[in-house]
Amino acid sequence: MLKFKYGARNPLDAGAAEPIASRASRLNLFFQGKPPFMTQQQMSPLSREGILDALFVLFEECSQPALMKIKHVSNFVRKYSDTIAELQELQPSAKDFEVRSLVGCGHFAEVQVVREKATGDIYAMKVMKKKALLAQEQVSFFEEERNILSRSTSPWIPQLQYAFQDKNHLYLVMEYQPGGDLLSLLNRYEDQLDENLIQFYLAELILAVHSVHLMGYVHRDIKPENILVDRTGHIKLVDFGSAAKMNSNKMVNAKLPIGTPDYMAPEVLTVMNGDGKGTYGLDCDWWSVGVIAYEMIYGRSPFAEGTSARTFNNIMNFQRFLKFPDDPKVSSDFLDLIQSLLCGQKERLKFEGLCCHPFFSKIDWNNIRNSPPPFVPTLKSDDDTSNFDEPEKNSWVSSSPCQLSPSGFSGEELPFVGFSYSKALGILGRSESVVSGLDSPAKTSSMEKKLLIKSKELQDSQDKCHKMEQEMTRLHRRVSEVEAVLSQKEVELKASETQRSLLEQDLATYITECSSLKRSLEQARMEVSQEDDKALQLLHDIREQSRKLQEIKEQEYQAQVEEMRLMMNQLEEDLVSARRRSDLYESELRESRLAAEEFKRKATECQHKLLKAKDQGKPEVGEYAKLEKINAEQQLKIQELQEKLEKAVKASTEATELLQNIRQAKERAERELEKLQNREDSSEGIRKKLVEAEELEEKHREAQVSAQHLEVHLKQKEQHYEEKIKVLDNQIKKDLADKETLENMMQRHEEEAHEKGKILSEQKAMINAMDSKIRSLEQRIVELSEANKLAANSSLFTQRNMKAQEEMISELRQQKFYLETQAGKLEAQNRKLEEQLEKISHQDHSDKNRLLELETRLREVSLEHEEQKLELKRQLTELQLSLQERESQLTALQAARAALESQLRQAKTELEETTAEAEEEIQALTAHRDEIQRKFDALRNSCTVITDLEEQLNQLTEDNAELNNQNFYLSKQLDEASGANDEIVQLRSEVDHLRREITEREMQLTSQKQTMEALKTTCTMLEEQVMDLEALNDELLEKERQWEAWRSVLGDEKSQFECRVRELQRMLDTEKQSRARADQRITESRQVVELAVKEHKAEILALQQALKEQKLKAESLSDKLNDLEKKHAMLEMNARSLQQKLETERELKQRLLEEQAKLQQQMDLQKNHIFRLTQGLQEALDRADLLKTERSDLEYQLENIQVLYSHEKVKMEGTISQQTKLIDFLQAKMDQPAKKKKGLFSRRKEDPALPTQVPLQYNELKLALEKEKARCAELEEALQKTRIELRSAREEAAHRKATDHPHPSTPATARQQIAMSAIVRSPEHQPSAMSLLAPPSSRRKESSTPEEFSRRLKERMHHNIPHRFNVGLNMRATKCAVCLDTVHFGRQASKCLECQVMCHPKCSTCLPATCGLPAEYATHFTEAFCRDKMNSPGLQTKEPSSSLHLEGWMKVPRNNKRGQQGWDRKYIVLEGSKVLIYDNEAREAGQRPVEEFELCLPDGDVSIHGAVGASELANTAKADVPYILKMESHPHTTCWPGRTLYLLAPSFPDKQRWVTALESVVAGGRVSREKAEADAKLLGNSLLKLEGDDRLDMNCTLPFSDQVVLVGTEEGLYALNVLKNSLTHVPGIGAVFQIYIIKDLEKLLMIAGEERALCLVDVKKVKQSLAQSHLPAQPDISPNIFEAVKGCHLFGAGKIENGLCICAAMPSKVVILRYNENLSKYCIRKEIETSEPCSCIHFTNYSILIGTNKFYEIDMKQYTLEEFLDKNDHSLAPAVFAASSNSFPVSIVQVNSAGQREEYLLCFHEFGVFVDSYGRRSRTDDLKWSRLPLAFAYREPYLFVTHFNSLEVIEIQARSSAGTPARAYLDIPNPRYLGPAISSGAIYLASSYQDKLRVICCKGNLVKESGTEHHRGPSTSRSSPNKRGPPTYNEHITKRVASSPAPPEGPSHPREPSTPHRYREGRTELRRDKSPGRPLEREKSPGRMLSTRRERSPGRLFEDSSRGRLPAGAVRTPLSQVNKVWDQSSV
């Protein structure tokens, strides 16, 4: 019941108080939409139009057949049918308007430019489809749009003229804005605008959005397409279909996504993704304004990316993804504006903040509508649409075929009641009432009087107004002149101010830039100084470290040197002691020589005495003997001393050897010291490298030059030092050579001394011999004395012997003399030897001194050399730093060189093959060259040998000369020694002679004894001498004792010396040990130093990284500082400008004050005048109020009079019509007799030209009516012809061919699709077969005139039977027969009950009415086309018959940006294997296409996709996505990228034709060799093949045992024995959709029956039934059905916490059941409502995962439902927002192996995400499907993905493994996943083609092996045309049938024409018998390799329909027996 409020009164009370007429008038006003006391926002929708809408709805609902059976309803309909028809005619309708063009097309509506036929006015009409609006009532808000347009008075919103509706559509007619939209304006300016233009349009957009907000609405879809430009250049905000009304808190609550993804605010996405309880306000519109501002300046959206999910992710993380490019330069105010809009909801600017923003400081917000716009569109006419992009007209606007009307009251039209609206309704009602009231005669006199008075007053006021207007014109003219001058001055002033401001801005920017540059310079200087300080400090540290290291090494070296020095000192002391001993020996030798001289002197004395004794005789001989004895003793002593001297010389040689060992140890120590110095030099080099590296960072070029100079200098120094080293080494070598020569000389001298010692010993021996002779002589003297004594006795004897004694004495004297001469000679020799010995000792001493000096000099030189080496190495190590940097660069170059070398090696391998022949000749030449080279080498070697021999000869000659010298010297000495020996021999001979003589004389002495006595006196004298000799002998003995004591002392010293030597040896050993320990310490210290160096390097790298980060921070801070300084400068400049303005304002204020004083006086005068006028105005207002009340009374009276007048008029019209009819009747009666009389018995013909005598008015009306009808008929006929021609032309243009006819290789489906478009037409409009295949030009010529059109050939074939669709839940993922997209499992689908074709519910209206069309009919119709074409003489082919031609208009993305900038209409031509794109249809002969696309690549692959995902084209209207097809090319090489081309077809038939034609061209690019190679490959097994009536519709499989597989079909449950090759039916169970075995209960869980009920079957009963299958009668199995779970489409079973659970999914809910062990049955525990049907279920250890619109997790403890994906993980934003882009869950797969952490793969329609058990991402990369998936299956480690005509296999690697997963693709016609196979890693697939069904076992590893052979990953999965895989099964059969000869007829050769020849020969196949117990011999295929090419969506029209069974009466070809081979290993 309606209640209308009038103030505070109750309507019932008011009705009781007011009269009925007043209430009727008020009710009339309410119906006119003008109820009193109601605002515009409170207006009720039930105006006159609303009540009419309600009346129309009531009438339509009552007209339903079900309600017409009610009597009262049928009476009501019959009663008011005419009235309703008349009212509907009076209502506005689409027929009142003529459509001129289409300017816009959206998701739910399209906008047309129309012209009102009656008035010619141009409007924009928005057409909306009611069904789409009702289906998306949460997205499209038509009521809000109508209310906003009708109630708005804002100039920023278009004015609504009319709103009306019909049965299928809603219409909004509003004012037309011909300037286009803002997107077109951006395209005009190349997507970027200046800031001045942006300022203007943003200001107007802000006012427009604010006007919507003031009305209480939020727009929610603000984008450039919804901002129009009117004819004056100002903007209008349109498209309020997404607007929402705000509540009292000014908030909006909505869950579904509203708006365009690129312009959505983050809070909208948050609410959309939440639980629906969140709200958002009008801030979302200001976010969209910010996005538009960003897009206007940068030419792109700030957050847009490839897919909507990524776009949503970027919007949610806008703080990270909002970036401002450097180009173009943008003012800081504008950047601040964008940042203030694209920010958080709380910080976002509102309307007040935007108005006060500095960017809009120059905007006059109150007069912006009157300001001139920057762009005014140029219009050619009122309906010009050139400023709009031409959109594509969608097929949904056209009227859909009639559907069956629902029975009963539906209520579908109730939401549209009150939609109608007419703008001029209220004004017209009032004016009509006034006019009708004025026609009434009531109160005419009073009105005339008042009219005269008012006319006079009006005349006076008009005169006054005329005078005032003249005065005003004069004043306006003067003011305009002044304003013109003023404006000119102001323009000049503004120009100067702007120039000044620009200059000031430039100055400020220059100042800031200078300051920033100065600061950066200072900073750079500081950095340079810091770097220098750091470098110096580092250099100092390195030097300090090197100094410390050098000190340590010097200390070690000094310690070693000190030890060596101590050893040297000790050795020198030993040498000194040895020298001292040698001096002692020499002194003793001198003493012995002196003693020898003394002895010689005494010997001479003795000789003198002997001479004296000769006279005396025997005394002298005795003395001589004593002397000889003494001489012998002296010789012995000399020999002992010589031995001691030899020992001393030996000790000296040992000391020399020890010294040499020490020198060698010293040299080794020096070498080790050099090694240490080299290492120190390396550390010094590291330090130098660091210093040089830091210098290179500062001064690159100077450092390079200095480094080069330094390198040259150091090289020179190095060469200089090396030369010095060489000189010093040479000098050392020379000194060592001198030393060696000296030592050799010393050794030679020692040898000479030894030889001389030998000579001395020989001489001593001679002295001994002489002593012995002396003793013998003394003995003789004694004897003589005795004889003299005897002679004294006898004088006779004395006398006789006197002479003899004298003779003997003389002889003795002679002998003494001889001996004295010999002793003198020996003494001379001894003196010579002593002199030589002294010379040798002196030379030895000098040589030793010289050696010491050389050693000291050598040490000094070595020290100096080491210092120079250290300095040189220090300088060299400084270069090594720079060299290491060069080496790093060299390593990079070497890496590049290595890459080039690898390429070079590859090239070399190729060259090696080409140079094989040349190498043979080269080898021969090489052999010849080698022979020559050998000869040359031999000659050269001989030359070298000769030179070496010459050198050796020279050396030998020198040595020989030296040896000769030595030999001469030695020989001379030997001659002297031999001379001495000869003398000794002569002396010995003389002694022997003397002995003989003595013997003779003794004989004489005996005779002269007497004479001896006389000599007694002489004897006494001799005795005295003997006494003297004895004393001398005692002295000699004493000396001998002294020599013995000295010998003992020397022995002691020798023992001490040996002890010292042993001690030195021990010290040497300890020294070696200490040296080894020192070496170990050195190695340890070296390792410590290296470790410290590594740590230092790591610290340096870390510090360098930190330094880089600090530098980046410093740079960012400096940039910010520069920006702030610029802002500061600008603010200062603004402050100065404001100060100047303030001063000017003050001056202006002063002038204004003065003017104010003047005006105040004038105001006082005017106030008085106004006061008088106010009094007059008050009186006039009073009179006006009086007139208003009188006017209202008159209106009421006029309305009453009008009602009465209408009644009277109706009565009068009825009377007049009755009287007219009576007159006509009477006139006809009067004329009738005359006609009869004239025509009776007369044979004349009637004259049709004679008019019938009727009244004139009636005839005129009748003639006018007939003319109008004829005109309408002509127009209707012309319109119909035009429509037919236009439709036929469009269809012909879409699929016409060129002048050639199609080749027989063209698929029959393409011709059948062309046939279908002709079959579904009516016969009178059906084109001929020739016209369908003829070129468009000939068809246009044929239909150019009506005569030619009527002469067309009308075929008798016609088929127009509509489908009987039933909308239900889809139980199997398949392909839509219309749009070629996926019909997903568990979603709503439309299925024809007759032909079983399936499509989307929205696509069912577009499917051609070809239900039940037999394939033979289409084939016959196609053959008729071919015959007509072949017989046509005008269709001669000019091109090769193998080419296929198709052309038509389609759309391609603008600028190849996936539709982000719209679509361009292009003319597409398929010519041969190329797709050519042109701008227009009329192509000239030489015109080149805009773009080309090659379908048959020589080194790549091309795939055709009949459907694409919505996320690929995020900015494309969702209504256009089903019409898009995609072509992809993938080259095999990585040098060229792939290519993608999207095409937008105008309709579904066009899309199907294009897809079929493109696929046929791509498929025709293969060659026979590739087919043969493909046929030879093997993969998997074909388990079963069913054909014709034996075909089963399989749904699922389950391995029941090792041999049996259960098969669920639409016909029931079957068991397949893979070993016995039999298929057995299990009775008692209906259609089976899913099977699962519960092993704990030994039950089979399945979905079965027509009701799709969940039921349990005992496993034992199934086994029993299989065991009894051979019996004629089997017991039926009765399943245990869950009555509460019916209509189930999916279930999952598992074990959670040791409890058996079932999760069953139904269309609107999910049911959870748990097994109760006490009751032994499953009980329902929870029912959960779902917004979308569940598509997947997975059991975990503690919960259940399900997929509906999102992935949810059900906790099995509390049975709570929550989202599975973690919202806090921003990387999962594409998956979280997937539902908003129509990408829903498909499957859940657990991919972790046993024992690993749980990991799941969540599969969506377009991608897959890896997550862990907590819903968080577990892997960084997602899986992308290469095409639209149907189903998923996982068999570890392979993921199987079924597509339309292919299977994709992906190897899921472990989580730790890196790299992309391996993929393989198999071409399988219509694959359907059945279930897992018996073997691991394999699945069962069902493949249906034509009337055959094949069950395939596909194994993952086989697929991988075959797939990876040519297809590595998605990018390499496409083979080249020369290496492409085998054809599909359909293509193979088609080509085999076409190429194979006709089979012989007869009973022995029954063959099916479509069976491949390869499967026929020698093979038998048994047909399946449906009777139980009869085994089925399944097909044993040879395991033909299924092609691994990419998918080619066939897009055929009959493919889906052919899957069902043929209708009754269709003829089937009998099966032939075929025997095939089958491998059981992989089942």
UniProtKB/Swiss-Prot annotation:
Name of a matching Pfam family: Pkinase_C
Modification Phosphoserine occurs at: 433, 440, 480, 582, 1940, 1993
Binding annotation for ATP: 103-111, 126
Positions where N-acetylmethionine occurs in the chain: 1
Name of this protein: Citron Rho-interacting kinase
Species this protein is from: Homo sapiens
Positions annotated as active site in the UniProt record: 221
UniProt gene name: CIT
Keywords: Acetylation, ATP-binding, Cell cycle, Cell division, Coiled coil, Cytoplasm, Developmental protein, Differentiation, Disease variant, Kinase, Metal-binding, Mitosis, Neurogenesis, Nucleotide-binding, Phosphoprotein, Primary microcephaly, Serine/threonine-protein kinase, SH3-binding, Transferase, Zinc, Zinc-finger
Family classification: Belongs to the protein kinase superfamily. AGC Ser/Thr protein kinase family.
UniProt-annotated stretches for the region Interaction with Rho/Rac: 1091-1302
Cellular compartments annotated: Cytoplasm
